[in-house]
Amino acid sequence: MVQWKHAALLALALAVVGCSSNSKKELPPAELTDFKEEVVLSKQWSRSVGDGQGDLYNLLEPAVDGSTIYAASAEGRVMAIQRETGDVLWKKDLERPVSGGVGVGYGLVLVGTLRGDVIALDEATGKKKWTKRVNSEVLSAPATNGDVVVVQTQDDKLIGLDAASGDQRWIYESTVPVLTLRGTGAPLIAGNMALAGLASGKVVAVDVQRGLPIWEQRVAIPQGRSELDRVVDIDGGLLLSGDTLYVVSYQGRAAALDVNSGRLLWQREASSYVGVAEGFGNIYVSQASGSVEGLDSRGASSLWNNDALARRQLSAPAVFSSNVVVGDLEGYVHLLSQVDGRFVGRERVDSDGVRVRPLVVGSWMYVFGNGGKLVAYTIR
């Protein structure tokens, strides 16, 4: 309960002060400026998914499998929607608060709850297949390979569940710092490994069948005198491209690791709690300060930096066509050129804000607003 209070307070502090622990008088979010519009988004459909992210700092992300997009709201509504027409295929009200999701694949739709439950629904019908109590909040999407479901809890446990029954197969535990951000990155399954970023600033790989450690690598080293200064959570999730794993921590570093060994390929100073994207041979980072930066994926040199969205609480970036896309606290999605970071487009989606990464599938982009609005776009 102590950690819950600290984490909730820290999340609130980050929202209020624009993720800076040192400023005495904080500046307001940067005002949006005019630019020459080069890319225009075309809205294809819009649907309401319950209360969206709810009142807590949830990061409920939609997921696509085939022709269907799945989304969940904080109040417990889960929906399956035909991703090109917007037709609702099914909806399920779980009658309990959802805090992590959505994971999808191998016939399962997976969410986690504030009460520490993992719930598996049938992908085709929405019928509940099983529920498993894991005794800690689940704040990110579970992952599955069809045999094992891997869950990361708020107290940085990785838990392997049987995909058919929900029975626990293994548990991997780590030491949690005194103070952490509210949230965890979603675990990632790659071959025989389950990968996760931890609140300690480490990335770990464990055997997906047994939960035994394969390797661990520290990405960020806690520094500073106060517990707040020493927060180095990896909350933005991991990005796997070929054999390279990209990761970024809060108040730490962006880094590239060899996924097979955990060997550090490169690193550079960065601070982000939302993660990275890849495109054009580059890595894109939404910094905690509100700047968006393009890095060379081979050596981490900075290619460009756009700081015009300072203190606007940006979402994780996504790559859509030749553009980098981020959402912000006022519900805008901003499109930046991958080449030089200049603004090329802007669209307001949800006046309650856009906190989660836009989801891109081919020529379609799906944006889930904090208020529950799920909107599908193409480029005009």
Curated annotation (Swiss-Prot):
Belongs to the BamB family. Keywords: Cell outer membrane, Lipoprotein, Membrane, Palmitate, Signal. PROSITE patterns: PROKAR_LIPOPROTEIN. Part of the Bam complex. It comes from the Bacteria. It holds the Pfam family PQQ_2. Its main location: membrane. A lipid is attached at C19 (N-palmitoyl cysteine). Residues 1-18 form the signal peptide. Gene3D superfamilies: YVTN repeat-like/Quinoprotein amine dehydrogenase (2.130.10.10). One of its GO terms (biological process) is Gram-negative-bacterium-type cell outer membrane assembly. This is Outer membrane protein assembly factor BamB. The keyword Lipoprotein applies. GO terms for cellular component: cell outer membrane. It is a lipid-anchor.
